[in-house]
Amino acid sequence: MNGVATVTYVVFNGTNEITSLEGDITKEADATIPCTTVTLSDILSNTAQYESMRVKVEMVEAKDVFTSNDDRSATIVDGDLELSLYNGYGSSTYKEFRVNAYVNVTGYPYMYVKNSTSTPTLKVWTGDIEAVKDDAVNITDAQYGTAYYADAFFMPMGATGYIAESNGNGGITLKETYAEGDLVPAKTALVLNAPKGNYDICLAESDAIAPTNNLLHGTTTEKLTEVEGGTYKYYKLSYNNEGNDLGFYWGSENGAAFINGAHKAYLALDSETLLSQSRGFSLADLAHGVTTGINTTVKSATQSNFIYDLNGRRINSLNGAAKGVYIMNGQKVLVK
């Protein structure tokens, strides 16, 4: 509506309610009600400023949910802040939310008064689920962990996500790809870097595509590692035999498949490449992109005479090979 009006109102449960209205008012078709994005802190600290305004709060956690219409039992939280909700509109979709989901809620703030007690409240008009909380990812003292989910998820606050990719020089490197708050596409296997602690994973819906050059893979349940389309060596995030260097190391003898943990990521390398003959790679090397097939190959008494060129391609024999440098059992061999 547009125009000037004279109204009579009463205060009911802390809300100014119009009882009569007079004036020259023109109805506007298809009008859009302005909506202001606010935080819980905004509403709680100055409810009067936003009273009867249409506002929207984003990415807050549903602590309790409605069980019926005309229900005041639901609350949303943001850290230590908590706001009561009122399901006063029959069209409200908030009743469909799940506890612990991260939600966006649109409504009208007011001060609910009962028994001389005033409570800041948001009368819900509508809302939607932004993300659903899943089990937390544990980051150890080493400040690293891995993650893999069938659904998209938001990178936890304080965490950074890395993929593993070829560095174009016969080696691999960890590439910083997702910052805190970023939406990670479904089925994206990651190394996470964050201070020690448990980090909630908030699942979301997204059509974004996972990076296709990622050498990390994962499973949503405890399952044998497997990558289709070739023969692979498999590496698990763990410490080396000395227990002093965290990285990706063979999870089973000779890089064979191993049982991967639920929602964990692992590294898979084509067994025909020079890199796959390495027993493992420290995160320090991977983070700086200095890992190559030459300086990471680990020799053993039972190692076969595999031969590779400097691009990591395996060749059958040095007989008839073009002039150049080749790698055999981790040693450089010059063909003149």
Residue ranges, per PLM feature:
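OB-fold nucleic-acid-binding modules
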Residues: M1-D134, V298
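Append "Rare intracellular matches occur via the same short Y/T/C beta-strand/loop motifs
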Residues: A101-G107, T188-L192, K323-K332
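Short, exposed beta-strand-loop hairpins at the edges of beta-sheets
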Residues: M111-S118, L267-A268, V325-I327
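C-terminal outer-membrane/trafficking sorting elements
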Residues: E165-S166, A287-K336
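A short, polar beta-strand/turn micro-motif
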Residues: T15, T19-S41, E130-M157, E180-L246, ...
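Short, surface-exposed beta-edge/turn micro-motifs
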Residues: S52-R54, D71, P185-A189, H263-K264, ...
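Contiguous mid-protein beta-loop-alpha structural module that forms a pocket-lining wall or clamp
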Residues: M1, A164-N167, L190
